[in-house]
């Protein structure tokens, strides 16, 4: 999910190798030599291994402070930054307008269909889909200017680690929780630019199939994973367009990170995922929920929610209970439901992201006033940085989290009717 806030220190290090995005169309890429391409792939794979967090000998596989975090500077991170910058610079006025207009969907909620129809007409789902495509075609590049290229702020799993390193720790915990092993096939819902999928394959040896609504991100995911030498697959697909294009019992596991607030009907989606998972397979979500302390009748709570939903790109407002109920209705057995962040808070990481992007915004606005940058940079960054501290406040008040974890399992044998 796109988290429209910011990151710690500028583009200095990258946990998984460089970003070979096709969309930026930077000329001069040298793919003419098979030997050089093989060398590039070997370098990429080595870079992934080298930049994973390392554990001290004998350390537990927990989210304590036992990890030695790799904070080394990487020139590949600068390449990602520059490519994203170029893409944003070259946006057309129509692309900017469509992105800004897409925020209208975050003032609504899937649960209020009458309001959706009143705003968008009976084909509101198609309108929401178009808005999401316009939103993600820009937000993924904005996020790539900071530490949220993967478009999510992770749970706080190590207080000493950076946002990116906490992402890696989160992804590795997912792989362990759902039992990923070489030869397994796993579905990644809302795969983004394929960076999480690449780390999952590097860490576990499993093969990932990713789906995403944004063709731009899918193209980047393809190229990135191919250059890593991974056989992962990525397809353009709206998660609300069911059934999914997969055979019954064709996957060994499923995970998603902060994509379900875009889901119109979680119950229908979970039933579809149940269909395509093999018996005994694990299902894991890490996602946005409102927590029991949130009271929609409280004016302060409601005001904060109206500010935060557009910031994090949330259409729906699910709860842990609603997700658990939908999973059980689909046939899953829920085995875990918790918040993996230390002390249940990710506010420290959110604040780091927000501080970084607000710092970038100040520089952007200065350059725009001097006519050194197109004026749409200011428009985009003013929107991106809006209400980051409201997000921090809601997390500290334990009203919401974007990192709630639920693990479920498809039974080995279907229950008797």
Language-model features: where?
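Conserved class I S-adenosyl-L-methionine
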Residues: 183-190
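Conserved SAM-binding strand-loop segment of SAM-dependent methyltransferases
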Residues: 228-242
